């Protein structure tokens, strides 16, 4: 340790015990370090908050939280996310106190605690207006002091405003005083003119609240009019009479006047035209006869005493009405159960009375089948209870009725069970499952315990029979049918044996080529119910030459001669099925070789370029040229280009746009070969007018330029060739898994399309990303997106950190001037803090993807900040945050937190929007790779947008699995994606099925009861299936199962998914 400042440096002696203990203490010092500690912060009552905590330790640690020293238990409102503590809605009572993050090493027992943190919670809460002085209302007398208190409280302290009969009371008036500190209103002295309804409101930085219960102050004065009898609302049928009663008292007696809505006075001498049948009696009552619709409205009775304000009493005259009743859905009940059917009364005035009838007889209020309130109750249901029941509703306006058809279900019984069957390959096959029941039973089929969904191969008839449209060998397995009604189900199974047809596997190609004077083989294989015998013979019946052997179906030529050409027949035969033949025409050819190949050529602009190419072979090859990714058609070349008979290409008057790679393609009926070379068009140097004796000759200058250009081009070609080779190997591996004719899937998050089957644009993209290009063209390509989307970093105002992704921090910010006419825009910002080259490349690919997509259900790229480190990607954000949190909140039991519950129709709408966004993404040949509820955003209008937050480092760390040196979303990944790294649109479809499951379970963790290793083992075994969520329609669960088909070919496209969900939206009930 250094000496203290200002004192001479001298050795410091330590006691021997201290010297011995220092190494020990150093060795036992805790290895747990807090990278980020929680800090005290402001919070709003009922809003979200996050206490961040990040630790670093050599081994696994257990992180938990304390509140005032007691462990914090996870709830729907307050729960751990990674090592941080998340609050879905801050509560001032439950969250007041000191929080502390604790990290414990369960192996060593070491423990570290963070600094204390707490919330400064801002809130406001409504309360009543109460009488403070005098002690009770009975003690209030004229000319006494009256004090009222407003029981609205909050933090910070709010300001108060008092009202009498809805009119604000200003401070400083002589007849009352207001004390904001005490929240009091004092009336001194109080008189009859102070009578009225007193209320208060309070304002603070958190918001506004008004009194939950108001105070009515009534100070009597004999000269003031007082209510004796107030008019009541009246409902009458058309053309009937209506009577309103109204009386006041005062000394001296008060005056009384009636007004209709338009403020027209009603008297016996002067009646308005629309109230000619109105009569006012001496006691103040108003009679209306033969009421019509124009008489309906508000009637006011006004009493005025000698002193005091007038008293206005209102009553409304309604005409009786009744609406139609909603339709009943047919009901199916099971025998022996108890069921209820509710009849909701139609809207009407007065409220209609409701009763049930069956077979024209009104149901009693007790018994086995009876009416209770508005409900039809059927106890211990019998089959005889089936039939039509009628609900009646009636009031003064008339009567309505609606029927409900009740069916009593029975358990299905067998008419014909499925039988073990032998089905012929290639022909239709049928399995019967005939049952009867009430109502008509539903039949489903299972193949190897997997539900059979109808597609091009399977069809289930209305009677339950299963048709296999074209039986294949692998259809030989167990089949099970289940017939069910609400009363129960029955099932049976049968074994299918496929009678394999005699066939070639695969059929030999009808035309094949063999290279002259080389060894060659022509295979022929076949299968059948019995192993077939395979032999070859010449089509003319002649025997095979001695140098040609037939070995178990393989025709082997030791050395191909011209005489070996001709027609051959492969014959496969067995006893039960006879024989089949395949004819093959063999051609002997000399395979193509290039006598002259085109070379790299540099030509001055305006001169003539010659690219030589000559090929030989038998049959004689035809030569074509491809330039700049298009075939050069000799009939459309124009006057500048010409292809000679020997295959050479000449270009006259070359221009800069002629620069590029030219490919010479030689082909005949047996094979195709190609070779290519670059053409460079350069400007001719202008000679100086006077050259000194030391100036180099012109040919020397050209030689220097040629060498420089040649060296640069050679370097670029070498690097591009290496990249092309690596990518071609990767693509070839993926293409092997795809059916013939299907275009290979594009690289994940890469926008470059395939050109003529070659990934040329993709190579160019890689060049831009890895800075291989050094010229202006490469620089312009690399910065095209960033220049167009540049946004100044100084215009971003960070709000809060959402979490950490593989790239770096993800946070919310306000962007100033981002959109025209909008001062500030709420945006999501992803930062690139990683120095890993692969992650930098992924970051670039992600911004390219969002920059190119334009769809209402995909977030937009709004800007880029790349003028300094770290780089920022500015993305669109919507107000409710990610879909995962939205789903979890929707099922919360906390009344302060819970939003409106989601109906099935709304859940389907959420899934449909994600499917439409992914359809747009896949149509543009992008692959997401991390589709999940956590990576979708949702607005208050429940609009969903596909995004890529990727908070794998903290908030959603538990949803990622460390596999092969990377963090992957294991529980959302298809088998081929996790086991082979084969990501495609079909692996995104698998993840979409899991997202649908998340929506219908309100954000539960997929495979929540299993450890990550168990989920991985199930994926490897092909058994990873999620159960049907509670309340999820079977039709939608079948769609999920289609998304989880083991073969990517059997999974639907996003267009099919969007269409199926659109149909389900129509069918779904709230």
Swiss-Prot record:
Residue intervals of the Ig-like C2-type domain: 31-120, 128-218, 225-317, 309-407, 412-497, 503-586, 578-680
Outcome of mutating residue 933 to V: In a colorectal adenocarcinoma sample; somatic mutation
Location of this chain's protein in the cell: Membrane; Cell junction
InterPro entries the UniProt entry points to: Cell_Adh-Cytoskel_Orgn (IPR050958), Ig-like_dom (IPR007110), Ig-like_dom_sf (IPR036179), Ig-like_fold (IPR013783), Ig_I-set (IPR013098), Ig_sub (IPR003599), Ig_sub2 (IPR003598), Kinase-like_dom_sf (IPR011009)
Annotated transmembrane regions: 705-725
Effect of residue 641 to R: No impact on proteolysis by MMP14
Membrane topology of this protein: Single-pass type I membrane protein
Stretch forming the signal peptide: 1-30
Modified residues (Phosphoserine): 1064
Secreted is among the record's keywords: no
Name recorded for this polypeptide: Inactive tyrosine-protein kinase 7
Organism: Homo sapiens (Human)
């Amino acid at each position: 340790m250094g000496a203290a400042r200002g004192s001479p440096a001298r050795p410091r002696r330590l006691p021997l015990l201290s010297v011995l203990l220092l190494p020990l203490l150093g060795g036992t010092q805790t290895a747990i370090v807090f990278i980020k500690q929680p800090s005290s912060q402001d919070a709003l009552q009922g809003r979200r908050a996050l206490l961040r905590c990040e630790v670093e330790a050599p081994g696994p640690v257990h992180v938990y939280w304390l509140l005032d020293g007691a462990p914090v238990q996870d709830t729907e409102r307050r729960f751990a996310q990674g090592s941080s503590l998340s609050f879905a809605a801050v509560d001032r009572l439950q969250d007041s106190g000191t929080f502390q993050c604790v990290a414990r090493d369960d192996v060593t027992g070491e423990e570290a605690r963070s600094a204390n943190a707490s919330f400064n919670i801002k809130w406001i809460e409504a309360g009543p207006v109460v009488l403070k002085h005098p002690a009770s209302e009975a003690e209030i007398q004229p000319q006494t002091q009256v004090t009222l208190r407003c029981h609205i409280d909050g933090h910070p302290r709010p300001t108060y405003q008092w009202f009498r009969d809805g009119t604000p009371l200003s401070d400083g008036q002589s007849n009352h005083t207001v004390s904001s500190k005490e929240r009091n209103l004092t009336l001194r002295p109080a008189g009859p003119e102070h009578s009225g309804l007193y209320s208060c409101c309070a304002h603070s930085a958190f918001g506004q609240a008004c009194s939950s219960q108001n105070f009515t102050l009534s100070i009597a004065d004999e000269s003031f009019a007082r209510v004796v009898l107030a008019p009541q609302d009246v409902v009458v049928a058309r053309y009937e009479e209506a009577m309103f009663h109204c009386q006041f008292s005062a000394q001296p007696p008060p005056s009384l006047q009636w007004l209709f809505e338009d403020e027209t006075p009603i008297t016996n001498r002067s009646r308005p035209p629309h109230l000619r049948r109105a009569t006012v009696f001496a006691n103040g009552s108003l009679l209306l006869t033969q009421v019509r619709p124009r008489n309906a409205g508000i009637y006011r009775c006004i009493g005025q005493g000698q002193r005091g304000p007038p008293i206005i009493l209102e009553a409304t005259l309604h005409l009786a009405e009744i609406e139609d009743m909603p339709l009943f859905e047919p009901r199916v009940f099971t025998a022996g159960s108890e069921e209820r059917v509710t009849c909701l009364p139609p809207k009407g005035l007065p409220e209609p009375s409701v009763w049930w009838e069956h077979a024209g007889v009104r149901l009693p209020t007790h018994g086995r089948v009876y009416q209770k309130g508005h409900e039809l109750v059927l106890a211990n249901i019998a089959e005889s209870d089936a039939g039509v029941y009628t609900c009646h509703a009636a009031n003064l306006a008339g009567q309505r009725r609606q029927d409900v058809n009740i069916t009593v279900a029975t358990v299905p019984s067998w008419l014909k069970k499925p039988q073990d069957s032998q089905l012929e390959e290639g022909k239709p096959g049928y399995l019967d499952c005939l049952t009867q029941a009430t109502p008509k039973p539903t039949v489903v089929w299972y193949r190897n315990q997997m539900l059979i969904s109808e597609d091009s191969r399977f069809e289930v008839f209305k009677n339950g029979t299963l048709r296999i449209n074209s039986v294949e060998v692998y259809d030989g397995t167990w089949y099970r049918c289940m017939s069910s009604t609400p009363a129960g189900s029955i099932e049976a199974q049968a074994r299918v044996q496929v009678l394999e047809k005699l066939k070639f596997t695969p059929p030999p190609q009808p035309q094949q080529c063999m290279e002259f004077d080389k060894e060659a083989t022509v295979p022929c294989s076949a299968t059948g119910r019995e192993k077939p015998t395979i032999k070859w013979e010449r089509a003319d019946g002649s025997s095979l030459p001695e140098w040609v052997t037939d070995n178990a179906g393989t025709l082997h030529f030791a050395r191909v001669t011209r005489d070996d050409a001709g027609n051959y027949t492969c014959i496969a035969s067995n006893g039960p099925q006879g024989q089949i033949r395949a004819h093959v025409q063999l051609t002997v050819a000399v395979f193509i070789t290039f006598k002259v190949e085109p070379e790299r050529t540099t030509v001055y602009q305006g001169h003539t370029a010659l690219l030589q190419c000559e090929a030989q072979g038998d049959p004689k090859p035809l030569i074509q040229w491809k330039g700049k990714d298009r075939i050069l058609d000799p009939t459309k070349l124009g006057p500048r280009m010409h292809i000679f008979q020997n295959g050479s290409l000449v270009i006259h008057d070359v221009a800069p746009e002629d620069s590029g790679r030219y490919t010479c393609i030689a082909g005949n009926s047996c094979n195709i070969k190609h070779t290519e070379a670059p053409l460079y068009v350069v400007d001719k140097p202008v000679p100086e007018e006077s050259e000194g004796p030391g100036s180099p000759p012109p040919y020397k200058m050209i030689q220097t330029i040629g060498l420089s250009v040649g060296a640069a081009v050679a370097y670029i070609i070498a690097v591009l060739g290496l990249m092309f080779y690596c990518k071609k190997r990767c693509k070839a591996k993926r293409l092997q898994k795809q059916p013939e004719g299907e275009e290979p899937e594009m690289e994940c998050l890469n926008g470059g399309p395939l050109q003529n089957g070659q990934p040329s644009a993709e190579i160019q993209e890689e060049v831009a990303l890895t800075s291989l290009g050094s010229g202006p063209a490469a620089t312009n390509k690399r910065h095209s997106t960033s220049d167009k989307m540049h946004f100044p970093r100084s215009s971003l105002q960070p709000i809060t950190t959402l979490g950490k992704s593989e790239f770096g921090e993800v946070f919310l910010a306000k962007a100033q001037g981002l959109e025209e006419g909008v001062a500030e825009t709420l945006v999501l910002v992803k930062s690139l803090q990683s120095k890993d080259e692969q992650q930098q490349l992924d970051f670039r690919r992600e911004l390219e993807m969002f920059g190119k997509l334009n769809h209402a259900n995909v977030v937009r790229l709004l800007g880029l900040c790349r003028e300094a480190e770290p780089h920022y990607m500015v993305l669109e954000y919507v107000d409710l945050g990610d879909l995962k949190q939205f789903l979890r909140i929707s099922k919360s039991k906390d009344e302060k937190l819970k939003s409106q519950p989601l109906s099935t129709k709304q859940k389907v709408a959420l899934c449909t929007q994600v499917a439409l966004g992914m359809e747009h993404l896949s149509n543009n040949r992008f692959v997401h790779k991390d589709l999940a509820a956590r990576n979708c955003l949702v607005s208050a209008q429940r609009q969903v947008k596909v995004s890529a937050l990727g908070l794998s480092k903290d908030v959603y760390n538990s949803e990622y699995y460390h596999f092969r040196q990377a963090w992957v979303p294991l529980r959302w990944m298809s088998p081929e994606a996790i086991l082979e790294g084969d990501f495609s649109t079909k692996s995104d479809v698998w993840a979409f099925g899991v997202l649908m499951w998340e929506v219908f379970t309100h954000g539960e963790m997929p495979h929540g009861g299993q450890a990550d290793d168990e989920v991985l083992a199930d994926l490897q075994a092909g058994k990873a299936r999620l159960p049907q969520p509670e309340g999820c329609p079977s039709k939608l669960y079948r769609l999920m199962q289609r998304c989880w088909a083991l073969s990517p070919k059997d999974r639907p496209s996003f267009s099919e998914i969007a269409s199926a969900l659109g149909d389900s939206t129509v069918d779904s009930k709230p």
